[in-house]
């Protein structure tokens, strides 16, 4: 009997260690979480510096080149995203999907509907959320296949319920003035590879829910358990909850070139200090204009790594950047202009923290930021990690260039929207990259095949493609399955029981 128990124990222990080695390395990383976030921040800074250098080299004062070169120089602003898609040889409207090659930061590589069909929105109605009409925006976003969604004309879309968007979709408002408002607005839940570009989003209200869904919060854009998300060149204001909220293990996000006005709680990144997966949240916030009538949360962070770079903060009433739960905040090359209220000069706020003993080890960094009207940033934590020391050897461009880098923030080519919306009007795109009005698809509300490449291939990569392939390798191990963890636990219990017999 003793020999049999001993044999069973040996068998169970062997099985235990075999399964344990199969799960090695055991980790809880999020999909698309980058193993070295400081290296991503470094690459963003390099991209800005290189784009500004190219602009300088191509300027008429430094070159006597051809008219095409002069045209390119008039297009370039030094903003690496805009220079990528606006300043190529071809008109952007003939190659809309080049936009997918132009993201930077943690959202780099977001495909959206790249290499998918073009879907043209011709119907601005939202009469039947449960069975949407072909030609409506809702019909396009619920399709399973990759789609590049464009709009046939200027339109105001009043949503009756939240707009739930499936993976591999691009909402491309270029060439038309597209306004989205109403109940729920945009919801990205457990999806990947979404690009939201050049839309007015405002006055979003909570929706009662439909089918089996509960009540929505009234966010402009709600990102829930999703990865590879890029929000670019949107104008947002006047929503019930947040303008952009990212929670529940969302990561690999870039929020760039947007124009935010007239709102209280602007941006939430992480919903609970105790939600451990949000430690893997990684967000780049770049080239945005935080304008009139904003109060707080630009952003408000929990856990994770947030890179705030070359933004223009022109107004806040409480604070600009807040956090709890030990997030890493890397602020570089921003302009912070404090309000006149002497009690609101501090850029930062450690939310719900009683004393500095609680947050003194949080890594909140400031480098190259411009502080105006008495603004000040309270840094904390380690001076620099080894990688961050390396990153700091590449200076972030001075905040004095923020005007230049954010000059086109918000809906591109439209009027600056200091009142929160600008009506259903459209101003043609300026510069050499413009070609207003082209929808890029058929006039009908259906789908038009575009190209013959497959999803995931790159038709027009930039000069930095090799670097990005190196930085954004897919070497992160997969998450362990709960069934496997439960099996390990049961084997341990059985082993212990056998030993005690």
UniProtKB/Swiss-Prot annotation:
Catalytic activity: Eliminative cleavage of (1->4)-alpha-D-galacturonan to give oligosaccharides with 4-deoxy-alpha-D-galact-4-enuronosyl groups at their non-reducing ends
Propeptide intervals in chain numbering: 475-501
First and last residue of the signal peptide: 1-22
Protein name (database record): Probable pectate lyase 13
Annotated keywords: Calcium, Cell membrane, Glycoprotein, GPI-anchor, Lipoprotein, Lyase, Membrane, Metal-binding, Signal
Domain remarks: The C-terminal domain not found in other pectate lyase-like protein is required for PMR6 function since the pmr6-2 mutation confers resistance by introducing a frameshift in the mature mRNA which eliminates the C-terminal domain.
Gene: PMR6
Compositionally biased region (Basic and acidic residues): 343-357
Cofactor field: Ca(2+)
InterPro entries with a match to the protein in the record: AmbAllergen (IPR018082), Pec_lyase (IPR002022), Pectin_lyas_fold (IPR012334), Pectin_lyase_fold/virulence (IPR011050), PEL (IPR045032)
Subcellular location: Cell membrane
């Amino acid at each position: 009997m003793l020999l049999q128990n001993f044999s069973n124990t040996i068998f169970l222990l062997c099985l235990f260690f075999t399964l344990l080695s199969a799960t090695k390395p055991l980790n809880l990383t999020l999909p698309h979480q980058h193993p070295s976030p400081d290296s991503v921040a470094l690459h963003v800074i390099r991209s800005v510096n290189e784009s500004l250098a190219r602009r300088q080299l191509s300027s008429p004062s430094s070159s006597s080149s051809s008219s095409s070169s002069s045209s390119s120089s008039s297009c370039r602003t030094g903003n690496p995203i805009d220079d990528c898609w606006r300043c190529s040889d071809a008109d952007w409207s003939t190659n809309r999907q080049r936009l997918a090659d132009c993201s930077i930061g943690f959202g780099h590589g977001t495909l959206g509907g790249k290499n998918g069909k073009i879907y043209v929105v011709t119907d601005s109605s939202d009469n039947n959320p449960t069975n949407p009409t072909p030609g409506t925006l809702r019909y396009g976003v619920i399709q399973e296949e990759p789609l590049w969604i464009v709009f046939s004309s200027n339109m105001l879309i009043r949503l009756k319920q939240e707009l739930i968007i499936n993976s591999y979709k691009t909402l491309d408002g270029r060439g038309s003035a597209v306004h989205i408002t109403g109940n729920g607005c945009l919801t990205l839940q457990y999806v990947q590879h979404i690009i939201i570009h050049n839309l007015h989003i405002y006055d979003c209200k909570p929706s009662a829910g439909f089918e089996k869904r509960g009540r929505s919060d009234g966010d402009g854009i709600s990102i829930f358990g999703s990865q590879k998300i890029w929000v670019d060149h949107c104008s947002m204001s006047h929503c019930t909850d947040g303008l952009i909220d990212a929670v529940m293990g969302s990561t690999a996000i870039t929020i760039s070139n947007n124009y935010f006005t007239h709102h209280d709680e602007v941006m939430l990144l992480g919903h609970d200090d105790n939600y451990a997966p949000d430690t893997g949240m990684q967000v780049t916030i770049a080239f945005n204009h935080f304008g009139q009538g904003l109060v707080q949360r630009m952003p408000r962070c929990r856990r994770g790594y947030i890179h705030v770079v070359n933004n223009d903060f022109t107004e806040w009433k409480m604070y600009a950047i807040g956090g709890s739960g030990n997030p890493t905040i890397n602020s570089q090359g921003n302009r912070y202009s404090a309000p006149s209220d002497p009690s609101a000069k501090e850029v930062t706020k450690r939310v719900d923290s009683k004393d500095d003993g609680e947050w003194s080890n949080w890594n909140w960094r400031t480098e190259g930021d411009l502080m105006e009207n008495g603004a000040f940033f309270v840094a904390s934590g380690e001076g620099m990690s080894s990688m961050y020391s390396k990153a700091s050897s590449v200076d972030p461009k001075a905040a004095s260039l923020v005007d230049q880098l954010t000059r086109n923030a918000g809906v591109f080519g439209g009027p600056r929207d200091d009142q929160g919306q600008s009506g259903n009007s459209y101003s043609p795109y300026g510069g050499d990259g413009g070609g207003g009005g082209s929808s890029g698809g058929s006039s009908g509300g259906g789908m038009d095949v575009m190209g013959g490449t497959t999803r995931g291939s790159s038709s027009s990569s930039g000069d930095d493609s090799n670097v990005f392939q190196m930085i954004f390798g897919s070497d992160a191990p997969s998450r362990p399955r709960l069934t496997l963890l439960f099996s390990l636990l049961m084997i341990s219990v059985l082993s212990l029981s056998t030993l005690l017999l």
